[in-house]
């Protein structure tokens, strides 16, 4: 091995990085009907029009926190792939224990 670390294969200096599409406004992918279905599952009968944007905002903050913690676990384990267990541990750290995904 020539100083490439664990599993370092390949030749050259690393190669060009692929262009990644800039991610923005993806929160709009959480559609109004999807939010409605979640509310129905929670027993809600009528929904105010202002709820949809508020829900998207709250969901975005929640996911940012969980993903940040999950990525921290991944980096600490010197991996590049976030596993289901990383997410389970991240949720457990936030006192939102999730069962059924190993561990």
Swiss-Prot record:
Sites of N6-butyryllysine modification: 6, 9, 13, 17, 32, 45, 78, 80, 92
Chain positions found as N6-lactoyllysine: 6, 9, 13, 17, 32, 78, 92
N6-succinyllysine carried by residues: 32, 78, 92
Stored InterPro entries: CENP-T/H4_C, Histone-fold, Histone_H4, Histone_H4_CS, TAF_TATA-bd_Histone-like_dom
Residue positions where Asymmetric dimethylarginine is found in the record: 4
Keyword annotations: Acetylation, Chromosome, Citrullination, DNA-binding, Hydroxylation, Isopeptide bond, Methylation, Nucleosome core, Nucleus, Phosphoprotein, Ubl conjugation
Residues annotated with N6-acetyl-N6-methyllysine modification: 6, 13
Identification of the protein by name: Histone H4 type VIII
Highest classification ranks of the organism: Eukaryota, Metazoa, Chordata, Craniata, Vertebrata
């Amino acid at each position: 091995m020539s100083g490439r670390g664990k599993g370092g294969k390949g030749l050259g200096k690393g190669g060009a990085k692929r262009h990644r599409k800039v991610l923005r406004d993806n929160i709009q992918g959480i559609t109004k009907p999807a939010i409605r279905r979640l509310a129905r599952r929670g027993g809600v009968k009528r929904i105010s029009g202002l709820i949809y944007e508020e829900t998207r905002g709250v969901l975005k903050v929640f996911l940012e926190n969980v993903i940040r913690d999950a990525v921290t676990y991944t980096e600490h384990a010197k991996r590049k792939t976030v596993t289901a267990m990383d997410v389970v541990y991240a949720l457990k750290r936030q006192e939102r224990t999730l069962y059924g995904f190993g561990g």
